[in-house]
Amino acid sequence: MAVRCCSSMASASVVLFFVVVGMSASMVSGCDRCVRRSKAGFRDSSIALNAGSCGYGSLAASFNGGHLAAASPALFRGGVGCGACFQVRCKDGKLCSTAGAKVVVTDEARSTNRTDLVLSAAAYAAMARPGMAAQLRTRRAVDVEYKRVPCEYAAGRNLSIRVEEKSRPPRELSIRFLYQGGQTDIVAVDVATVGSSNWKFMTRDYGPAWSTAQAPAGPLQFRVVVTGGYDGKWVWADGEVLPRRWTAGRVYDAGVQIADVAQEGCYPCDTQEWK
């Protein structure tokens, strides 16, 4: 998968349209780089986070060592926030380290009880100083500060596409993006037969899930617009991502990992450095 400039005025217009859409979604939560202050709680069982609103299912357990989180509606952004990463640290210096824990959003916390994030038990314990995890868990919620950070996966772990079970080859294709790196949002997805310039747009179903009822014949390549703040660009595969006979329920490697960090045009909402 490569990053390229658009080759025609028509393509440029499409990019502009989707960048504007992406800006609207991103502006809901303000500046990603800002340090925010709130409370964070935790869930004793990670099952709810694995089976959360983002629809990752059992695959969520492979995200970030199981350090997962449910996010408030403002951070979840109607599903656009699925897969986003946040660095979270509690403000009790006796119990918690200054490093905190990095979490991946897999669910929405609809009833937040004034908490912006509800962490998995493993992530909550990871905020603690050595030997203090048990004591930290006796407090169901703590004051925290957090900010969005780039997602980083192990070397060799690329952006991947899961073909959802509701897909019906060859025309009805529903996919879900997994392991998205960087600090951007995917705001547009196109699919085409490998070697063809006849791209078909896909519609966002919810969060990381996209679909089309007019999938072209395989093998298939994809291109996406990644954006956040005011910056956006196409990222796409030069070769095959899904084979000619793709299969529902399988995960396919996109052959690339996104490492971009979105540029923002907003005034810093917090001048305190993250130390």
From Swiss-Prot:
Residue span(s) of domain Expansin-like EG45: 51-156
Phylogenetic lineage: Eukaryota, Viridiplantae, Streptophyta, Embryophyta, Tracheophyta
UniProt name for this protein: Expansin-like A2
Keyword Secreted: yes
Pfam families: DPBB_1, Expansin_C
Domain of life of the native organism: Eukaryota
InterPro entries linked: Expan_Lol_pI, Expansin/allergen_DPBB_dom, Expansin_CBD, Expansin_CBD_sf, RlpA-like_DPBB, RlpA-like_sf
Species: Oryza sativa subsp. japonica
Main localization of the protein described in the UniProt heading: secreted
GO CC field: extracellular region
